[in-house]
């Protein structure tokens, strides 16, 4: 993908994919970067708040299920299991099944073609994902810590902010990374909810390089490479935190 971005369109089409270019050219990368600068900014504006809000609210939801599951009331525990099952099922609902009613809702709210509208739509899908992932990390926190804090008169919000969230921080970072990657690569939601070219996200903008009356293959390879910069950077610089989160999940034991 990187190599073919340095080729001319004819060479990218006719030469083997892994063959080095006969003459290096930055024309494709420069042209594509100028075209994708705005979509890249749009994606960052949408993805960053989506990931943080989804992970944070998902963590709060996971803590709510955690406290219900350890309640002295058998009814509360049953309700917790039922709600958690519904949240888990929600993560398997395909985007296509809900985009029509979701689009109607966003149009009626007057937020179509806005950052708020696309963030709102993504939150609907990624908050359940955040709750599902964070529940696995919060469930290994010793129950005795929560009970001791409650005996001292600490409220649930303070327990969550001062005890639960810090102890589950590896899981929070792992969830954050996962949602960033998923929302960055999301294609269907921005394709349906954004109609103005100036508001396009990078996932939709890259698709515009194919089809039509022809395909400039060197530009397509360059666009795919530029669009992958953010996910690659996250894995390079934050990948170790993702691994730590998985290790913490595998090594933790509830009390």
PLM regions: where:
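A structural signal for multi-pass alpha-helical bundles of membrane permease subunits
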Residues: 1-255
């Amino acid at each position: 993908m990187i190599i073919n971005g340095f080729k001319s369109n004819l060479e990218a089409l006719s030469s083997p994919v892994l063959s080095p270019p006969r003459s290096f050219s930055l024309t494709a990368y420069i042209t594509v970067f100028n075209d994708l600068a705005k979509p890249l900014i749009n994606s960052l504006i949408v993805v960053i708040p989506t990931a943080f809000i989804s992970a944070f609210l998902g963590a709060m939801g996971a803590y709510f299920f955690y406290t219900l599951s350890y309640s002295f009331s058998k009814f509360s525990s049953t309700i917790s299991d039922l709600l958690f099952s519904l949240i888990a099922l929600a993560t398997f609902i395909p985007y296509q099944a809900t985009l029509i009613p979701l689009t109607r809702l966003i149009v009626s709210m007057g937020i179509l073609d806005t950052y708020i509208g696309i963030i709102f739509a993504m939150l609907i899908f990624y908050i359940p994902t955040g709750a599902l992932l964070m529940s696995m990390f919060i469930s290994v926190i010793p129950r005795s810590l929560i009970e001791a804090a409650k005996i001292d008169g600490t409220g649930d919000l303070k327990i969550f902010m001062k005890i639960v969230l810090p102890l589950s921080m590896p899981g929070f970072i792992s969830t954050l990374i996962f949602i960033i990657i998923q929302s960055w690569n999301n294609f269907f939601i921005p394709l349906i909810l954004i109609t103005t070219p100036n508001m396009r996200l990078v996932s939709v903008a890259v698709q515009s390089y194919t089809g039509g009356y022809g395909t400039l293959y060197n530009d397509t390879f360059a666009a795919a490479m530029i669009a992958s910069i953010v996910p690659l950077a996250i894995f390079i610089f934050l990948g170790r935190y993702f691994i730590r989160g998985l290790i913490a999940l595998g090594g933790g034991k509830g009390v």
